[in-house]
Amino acid sequence: MRELMSEFKELRLHGMAGAWEELTANGGSRVEASRWLIEHLLQAEHTDRVMRSIGYQMHAARFPVHRDLAGFDFEQSKVDQKLIRQLADLSFAEEAQNVVFIGGTGTGKTHLATALGVSGITHHSKRVRFFSTVDLVNALEQEKAAGKAGRIALGLLRMDLVIL
């Protein structure tokens, strides 16, 4: 019963937690027989919430296109594959460090940066925001002209990873 109660509370289903506690106290074996159904429903709810959260975060990140590391051709690039895979764990973000990709047009900088952002959302539950530098500067200028300076900066401070 303990794991069901913690699942109810983790999902903020406090009314169900109280009802389950009452049912198990009064219902005995009939209630225990339906335990598998409740466990299955809780797992489905948890999975659905995770998937909706990922979908929301992917939309909020505003990536130009969806890219991941599986789609990057390391054979055609001089990029250190081991280093990129190491960066994908996002430990640099936890340590408040920056990563800068330098290279000419078409070398995969945006692809790799987007892939790190996608990895951050899907595997590490990070909040990510992608901006082209030109779009960010324009948005900051518009914000300043509207007399609302600082709102974008406050929004970016809430992010775990900002990609420019």
Describe the role of every protein-language-model region:
Residues 9-64:
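Interdomain "pre-motor" coupling segment immediately N-terminal to P-loop NTPase/helicase cores
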